[in-house]
Regions:
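Conserved RNase H-like, two-metal-ion catalytic cores of nucleic-acid enzymes
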Residues: 2-135, 139
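Acidic, Mg2+-coordinating catalytic module of metal-dependent nucleases/exonucleases
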Residues: 145-166
Length: 166
């Protein structure tokens, strides 16, 4: 590991498109079902721009499956069944940072994590002085996260490429 954290320009697999149609949702569920290991999960909201705490983008990654950027509002309008998603991930451990922020929105959508690992709680238990996601990622992986879109209006459509890269 170098002394200076490395900023990743974009994901190894490239910047993913948003999954906002029923066929794309079903394809992604199939990808997840045939993949393995833990499920990294995150959600983005538009709290500073809209009333409510609903998720406007949910993000997932699992070994053997691509990065999934899912538009829960568009998928709900299309009739997506989150039970298909739940079956696809099974009892995989969901990895979240500050899960108290994201779990209510996941539950509202119908996602049902069976097992959970919270990296913020782990960082606190390990005695890290800085336990935000960027600090934890830098500490353990030597990677710098770009955080310029963390407070963006995630309800905006279509999502710009640099937001999808975030």
């Amino acid at each position: 590991m170098t002394d200076e954290p490395k900023l990743l320009a974009e994901p190894r697999e490239g910047v993913p498109n948003v999954i906002d149609t029923l066929p794309a949702f079903r394809d992604y569920c199939s990808e997840l079902a045939s993949s393995h290991g833990s499920l990294a999960a995150d959600a983005e909201r538009a709290s500073g721009f809209r009333y409510g705490h609903e998720d406007w983008l949910v993000q997932f990654k699992r070994d053997g499956a691509g990065i999934g950027l899912l538009d829960p509002q568009a998928l709900a309008a299309a009739g997506a069944d989150w039970n298909d998603f739940n079956r696809a991930v099974g009892d995989a451990v969901w990895i979240l940072h500050d899960s108290l922020q994201d779990l209510p929105g996941f539950a509202e959508l119908g996602m049902e994590p069976q097992r959970l690992f919270d990296t913020e709680i782990a960082a606190r238990l390990l005695g890290l002085k800085r336990f935000g996601l960027a600090a934890v990622t830098e500490h353990f992986l030597g990677l710098t996260l770009a955080k310029e879109h963390s407070a963006a209006d995630w309800s905006y459509r279509p999502l710009p490429r640099d937001w999808r890269n975030y």
